[in-house]
């Protein structure tokens, strides 16, 4: 009987230790998310971390109360303790606290969502790239190039989308058939391509590299092969690429 509290603590702590053992020191602060490579990605990561902190605080408090009740208020003998019901102050407290928690999470989420989905005015210096989903690949058209300059991929030939480092980019998302979803995990951002409408979002890449992208909406037979790459390059290299594409389309 005396070892029961220790056993209970061990049962609670062991799963947490095993879970943390699967994370490296560099990955642990991100709590399962990849390292962000855009300005909006850092904001998404901060929101994710804040939500986890709130969840852990609430969870620790609730589990603490449960363990406290199990250890110090377990039933002893045949004595039945006083039964408490219809306690209006406690019921009000149980209603207000969850409401406040949800309200705080909502405020921060709404604030960050408004920033992440904000579109720059037409007068702003923004690179516009039209992304069209097709079964089962992608078409990329850079607005700075002639209309007939379209990079089209296939399930066997994965297309590459080039972005300039440190410069604002807007994606105009459309589909010519079924619904798809444009997802680059390193962006910490996913947006659907819905038939009959154009969805938009903007990012500013802040890290050079090549990042995998994919369709995140089940769209048919070759959905799993609907892949693409995103390569973030220096602005000079990006402009050179556009000139090369323009020359090949001439």
Where are these regions (language model features)?
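Membrane-entry segments of alpha-helical transmembrane domains in multi-pass membrane proteins
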Residues: 2-8, 42-61, 96
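Alpha-helical transmembrane segments
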Residues: 59-73
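Non-transmembrane, membrane-proximal soluble domains of secreted or membrane proteins
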Residues: 24-50, 70-250
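N-terminal secretory/membrane targeting signals
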Residues: 1-25
């Amino acid at each position: 009987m005396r070892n029961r509290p220790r056993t209970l603590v061990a049962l609670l702590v062991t799963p947490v230790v095993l879970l943390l053992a699967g994370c490296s020191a560099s990955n642990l602060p991100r709590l399962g998310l990849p390292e962000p490579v855009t300005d909006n990605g850092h904001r998404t990561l901060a929101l994710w971390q804040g939500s986890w902190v709130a969840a852990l605080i609430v969870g620790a408090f609730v589990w603490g109360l449960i363990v406290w009740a199990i250890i110090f208020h377990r039933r002893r003998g045949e004595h039945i303790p006083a039964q408490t019901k219809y306690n209006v102050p406690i019921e009000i407290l149980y209603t207000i606290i969850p409401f406040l928690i949800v309200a705080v999470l909502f405020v921060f989420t709404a604030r960050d969502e408004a920033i992440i989905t904000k579109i720059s005015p037409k007068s702003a210096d923004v690179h516009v790239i039209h992304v069209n989903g097709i079964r089962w690949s992608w078409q990329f058209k850079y607005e700075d190039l002639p209309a007939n300059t379209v990079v089209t991929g296939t399930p066997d030939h994965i297309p590459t989308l080039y972005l300039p480092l440190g410069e604002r980019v807007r994606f105009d998302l459309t589909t010519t058939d079924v619904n798809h979803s444009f997802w680059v995990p390193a962006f910490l951002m996913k947006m659907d391509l819905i038939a009959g409408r154009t969805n938009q979002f903007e990012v500013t890449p802040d890290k050079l590299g090549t990042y995998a992208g994919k369709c995140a909406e089940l769209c048919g037979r070759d959905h799993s092969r609907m892949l693409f790459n995103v390569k973030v390059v220096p602005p000079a290299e990006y402009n050179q690429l556009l000139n090369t594409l323009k020359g090949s389309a001439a």
